[in-house]
């Protein structure tokens, strides 16, 4: 739903090395749009609470990469034949400096907390460089802004954000520009979508460990288009597991049955005042990704 914040946990088959801990950094890929500023607002407030550092990352491309990127993507500059690489780089630096100045103004006015942040530029394909940086630096979370409900449905998440969500091993929090929340402490109820896969339990543990300093209730939901007794049996088993594993967490359990799964989910979100949707992005091979 357009009014909800989308949180995606990407859990893959490979195990994270136990000796490597995630850094106390929050990564914000920015494209100088209004929804980038919304992501900054949320991230800066989270960084204040978690005593974290914010990294603003912008990825630009030169004509070398132009043919590899889709038209109309919010991260792209339109490159004319008359533009030189030098001009492109100057434009990127100018835009990033303008963003930094705008953030400084918001810090001075008190709209943003005064926390440590830095700006980084990388050349390449946006989603690839975002994922590469996340793999290298291991931030605690990636926060990305998305378009609001006045935009076309296909644009709500955006191709770059969707690709990062699909492939990232780091939690990705996508913030619609029209979301009323300014910080995570305002979130009161989270929906966690499960397919009764064991990886969902791993994803939930990672999700819980990331946000356990906040207070919220969780709705564990399964989406289906037909009645299946096994769903009820599996749900009963999950109830028992979560009761033992998370005794202090308020959890609701529901099976949503609707011929139109997205319509059923949207209605559930409205009826139950869900603030964030959490889901697991399973690792798929190249053929599954294509088809």
Where are these regions (language model features)?
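Intrinsically disordered or low-complexity boundary/linker segments at protein termini
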Residues: 1-41, 112-114, 140-152, 156, ...
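Structural beta-alpha unit
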Residues: 1-4, 10-21, 61-64, 90, ...
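Small/aliphatic-rich secondary-structure junction motif
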Residues: 8, 18-82, 188-252, 274
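A short acidic, glycine-rich active-site loop
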Residues: 76-94
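N-terminal membrane-insertion helices
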Residues: 89-100, 235
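Short secondary-structure boundary segments
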Residues: 146, 222, 280-282
């Amino acid at each position: 739903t357009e009014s909800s914040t989308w949180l995606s946990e990407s859990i893959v088959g490979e195990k994270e090395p136990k000796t490597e801990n995630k850094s106390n950094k929050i990564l914000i890929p920015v494209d100088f749009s209004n929804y980038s500023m919304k992501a900054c607002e949320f991230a800066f407030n989270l960084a204040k609470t978690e005593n974290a550092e914010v990294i603003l990352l912008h990825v630009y491309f030169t004509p070398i990469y132009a043919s590899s990127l889709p038209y109309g993507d919010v991260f792209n500059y339109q490159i004319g034949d008359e533009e030189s690489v030098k001009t492109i780089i100057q434009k990127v630096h100018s835009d990033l400096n303008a963003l930094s100045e705008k953030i400084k103004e918001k810090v001075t006015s008190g709209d943003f907390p005064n926390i440590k942040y830095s700006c980084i530029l990388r050349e390449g394909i946006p989603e690839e460089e975002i994922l590469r940086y996340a793999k290298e630096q291991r931030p605690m979370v990636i926060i990305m802004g998305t378009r609001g409900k006045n935009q076309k449905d296909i644009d709500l998440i955006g191709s770059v954000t969707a690709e990062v969500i699909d492939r990232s091993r780091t939690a990705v929090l996508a913030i619609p520009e029209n979301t009323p929340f300014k910080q995570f402490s305002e979130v009161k109820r989270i929906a966690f979508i499960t397919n009764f896969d064991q990886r969902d339990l791993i994803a939930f543990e990672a999700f819980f460990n990331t946000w356990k300093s906040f207070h919220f209730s969780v709705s564990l939901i399964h989406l289906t288009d037909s009645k299946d007794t096994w769903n009820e049996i599996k749900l009963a088993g999950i109830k028992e597991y979560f009761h033992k594993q998370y005794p202090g967490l308020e959890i609701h359990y529901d099976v949503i049955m609707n011929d139109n799964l997205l319509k059923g989910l949207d209605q559930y979100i409205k009826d139950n005042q869900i603030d964030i949707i959490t889901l697991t992005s399973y690792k798929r091979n190249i053929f599954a990704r294509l088809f």
